[in-house]
Amino acid sequence: MMETQLYIGIMSGTSMDGADAVLIRMDGGKWLGAEGHAFTPYPDRLRRQLLDLQDTGADELHRSRILSQELSRLYAQTAAELLCSQNLAPSDITALGCHGQTVRHAPEHGYSIQLADLPLLAERTRIFTVGDFRSRDLAAGGQGAPLVPAFHEALFRDNRETRAVLNIGGIANISVLPPDAPAFGFDTGPGNMLMDAWTQAHWQLPYDKNGAKAAQGNILPQLLDRLLAHPYFARPHPKSTGRELFALNWLETYLDGGENRYDVLRTLSRFTAQTVFDAVSHAAADTRQMYICGGGIRNPVLMADLAECFGTRVSLHSTAELNLDPQWVEAAAFAWLAACWINRIPGSPHKATGASKPCILGAGYYY
């Protein structure tokens, strides 16, 4: 009988707060479970340099390569900590899947840039490494995002009713899992990104811990309506977005400068919740259960806004109820995609991205 295989997934999302690594166990292409997690926060200097690359500037190519190397050393450190915590050696791992750090996402131009020096990561970890997952989907005419609906479908689908899985990272994305049709999904809009940027600008804090600042504010209805009028929300799916559309400077064009900073933050929380509600209502009105993952689940103000928007129509849950910690889901997805690559299984959710066909995602690097 063939032994089961272990994979590591490493994910650093649009919140740019650090790198998550998750250990999963597979039997060929069959998911058996997640077994461990490690997290390495980004140093402030690294985070600032990554944010600087979001905008055009001098010597971008050199800076991006240097940051790719620094990120890969940090990723290797995170993988090593995970292995140590599980009493494992690199030789115990079949492959490592690394998403990299997105700095540009431009599907309208056929590219999405994730920083990672994958050969260096393979060399540092001594583990076969799979990465550059988005390029293959883009080459097939897709958006290159979101890539997680196929993973959500493999783990979370129910054969009796439509479920949705909501990931709230810097960007929020939804996977819709009908019982009798292919999964689909798309980016609903900003998740934590604008809230984090506003908190950093006005309190010099990385994020609004437990929604404490937002809880002191009131929703500004006129501002909310102006934000909701962005044309992205009226576009049909498949669609994806990022900082290119929803950066702090975009928000500031709608402000007159006299708004209370707590009120703006409170409004941004409702903005995220409302765009999720509108997306589900338009694209998957028969959804009855929604499972939530990502950093946003730790914000009680945002969770209360989601509950108020959905009311009794949709029941909200954590993915922990489906046996996967909400902080582990995205990194686990890229471990799963590495397993798909090894087993030559198409892992692309082409119904979500708009690609012309299912694809085996990623490129592999031996150490």
From Swiss-Prot:
Binding site for ATP: 13-20
Function summary: Catalyzes the specific phosphorylation of 1,6-anhydro-N-acetylmuramic acid (anhMurNAc) with the simultaneous cleavage of the 1,6-anhydro ring, generating MurNAc-6-P. Is required for the utilization of anhMurNAc either imported from the medium or derived from its own cell wall murein, and thus plays a role in cell wall recycling.
Protein name: Anhydro-N-acetylmuramic acid kinase
Top-tier EC class: transferase
One of the protein's GO biological processes: peptidoglycan turnover
NCBIfam families: PRK09585.1-3
A Pfam family per the record: AnmK
Similarity remark: Belongs to the anhydro-N-acetylmuramic acid kinase family.
PANTHER family: ANHYDRO-N-ACETYLMURAMIC ACID KINASE
Pathway field: Amino-sugar metabolism; 1,6-anhydro-N-acetylmuramate degradation; Cell wall biogenesis; peptidoglycan recycling
Phylogenetic placement of the source organism: Bacteria, Pseudomonadati, Pseudomonadota, Betaproteobacteria, Neisseriales
